[in-house]
Amino acid sequence: MGKGQPIEPNIEQSLVDLCKRTVAMNLLHCYPTTTEHELSCEEWGNGTERSQSMAACQGCVELRKEVHDLRTAVNLILPMLPLYPQLPNTFTTAANIAAQPALHQVLQQSLLRRKPTAHTPTVPQPECPGQLRTVLSSPGSALPNVMLMNHLMINGLKPVSPTLPNGHIQPAVGEASMQTDEQQVKWSSPSSVDSNGQKTDSSAASAGDNQNIDVIGDGSESPTSSNHSVQELAMLTSHQNLFNAFKDSQFIFNQVPKQEPVAPLRVAPATNGTTNGATKAAGPERKPRKPVNDDIVKIVRNQDLSEENIATFQIPVPKAHLSDPTFRPVSEQQIIQQIIQGKKYDEMEVGETMIQLCKKLAEKRVFGPRLMSQTTVAGLNHSNYSNLPIKGICYIQHVCRKVLYDKFENEEDFWDKFREAMRKLAARCRRVRHAKKTKHNREEAQAEMLSKRYGEDIPFNLNGSGLIIPKSEPSETPAVNGDINMITMGQIGTLLTQFNADRKTPLTEVLPAELLTTFLSYLNRPKQEVQSPPPAQNPQNPN
């Protein structure tokens, strides 16, 4: 080499040092600006020629451009792709980490290849710089693959190559993992491989251009080839098999509850066009219940309604006195006069008049309110209460016919009005029943409250001024005999004392004491004469 020519710098060693520093700065997230001093001839020379200028060194200009492109590619690719492959069996141990080569050794072994200096149309520029292809796919790297170690993120991985579909190929168990660990992964440009994985004409240049061909991508097992894709998918499948083994053995999924199958939803039946879009509730259709007949007229008309038979009926009915022994019936003529002589008799219709006559006859003469509160008037099986005695209803029908039959048009009209009157009578029974219950409950509650405060006979223990008198203790004297001749002075004194206590004005203020004493003496003399016999008379001697 002549004296005037610049000495060729040791580019490979300098590029190795630059890549080492770039990788270190990238890992530390530090990107210093490239200065002119860092890329000068002094940096790439051997240190002996310091008089050469930057403009005179054309090789330095090209190297500066290549280094700039290299740094840009490293900054884009290095944070996204791991430098080291996954550790075997996804278990990181100290021995496995120690067995991995150091970072600077990997860079020195992988960057000592010369990149082609010219690009021809037949030799396209690869997607990744040649100095990084072996580094990124080197099997000797020691950094663990975080994405592949996490078996829970296997399904979220993207396909290895954009030219291959995303799928899983099931390999033989145990073969794929061994092949993947022993294979040396290489990088090749996707443009040099067709869709079938075969090399194209562009990858095979002439013999004179062999020095410009990227020898790293040469071979049938490049990362974008079919064989390499199958191996990558086989490695992912091995992780998935391990994940399924853990799942089957319930190693980490033993706490996941089993979901019970959901019952299928019932589909509502289609509606016809007559519903106008209204949907019916699902379930069996309920047929409308037939109302129970409350007509008692049929039962009455089947009876013997002759005047001679009705005259034999006992009115009021016997059950009326059994239910209420204090019931006092009103005469028939008196009830008829109350209806006819009423102010609204001329204004009322004949049906309303019959209703009023039936109510008064039932409550005041035939049944009584106590029996009506326990029964009803309706057809068979219409109510839980039993019917009123049929003889009493026949008697009411007879009175209504005798008084109001002339105002009806025909026989059927009479029975229609009588049917409505019986329904009103049943309603009257319900009202009497409710009134009796309410009154009885109110009276019982009031009597219980008063008896707790003042005694059992408190309603009758009131004086004339309305003040409550304390309950008197029972006397120890025997009860007064009904016969006045057998009464004693002590009993008379007790009666006078009680009588004086019950009076508003004391008895001594009205009658003088001498009169009372004389009266008591008069009452006591006949008793003494009866008790003491007369003295015996001696018979006179005739002599």
From Swiss-Prot:
Low complexity biased stretches: 268-282
Main localization (coarse): nucleus
Description of post-translational modifications: Cleaved by caspase ced-3 in vitro.
GO molecular function list: DNA binding
Compartment(s) of residence: Nucleus
Keyword Nucleus carried by entry: yes
Keywords (A to Z) from UniProt: Developmental protein, DNA-binding, Nucleus, Transcription, Transcription regulation
CC terms in the record's Gene Ontology section: nucleus
Region Disordered, annotated ranges: 165-228, 268-291
Composition-biased stretches (Polar residues): 177-213
Its biological purpose: Heterochronic protein which controls the choice of stage specific cell fates. Involved in the temporal progression of vulval fate patterning, possibly by inhibiting lin-12. Acts as a transcription factor involved in the stage-specific repression of insulin/insulin-like growth factor gene ins-33.
Protein name listed in UniProt: Protein lin-14
Organism of origin: Caenorhabditis briggsae
Gene name for this UniProt entry: lin-14
